């Protein structure tokens, strides 16, 4: 069975200027980013579908992205893969003092037990200290500085909101957020009445942001929830297509009422299957 060292050697061979792969040789940090995002989503997709037969391969594809960036950095004399492993190991030891109180990875497993809330508070404190260390002027730091701009918009909205909530800038419970969602929807309707396309886009953005806030207060991950909604829509629409294929009727010839009826049938069948399960 091949090892991590073999994968690193393979990556080095692929990037060999004389004998490597032309495609791999010309890649850069920036050109690989879309592939990295795609591989991460394929891992998430395999997990959500319960496709563990393919999960191992998808995790390998994602690991290869880390190896690729590390190879590029090694070629430029920045860091190596071993440094990546060392960095994350040190960070996790530092962030888990309740597990590694002495900072020794191999210390005896006899440590004081902390509550989940104590662990969470310590985790946030340590991350705040790490953010401060990244700046020469800690007093100018923003709590939002290290929220990646490249995150999917729903996830980034949730992270921005969570970060602000750490200093009390947050709704006290979910119910006021529901009212805020209604307010934002009303503002969308007002913009629609004025036929102001720029205002409509702005207000729809506010509505989405408020919906993410509601999800956060309900302890629902917005990206996961939306992926579930996407999967549900796809499943039901495929049901409509298959039902029409069975009757040899083009979907383009159907009225909206007929399509809605098939959509309702798809929902009923899902509900029946759920109750039987």
Q: For each predicted feature, which ranges?
A:
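Flexible "arm" and connector segments at domain edges
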Residues: 1-58, 64-204, 208-277
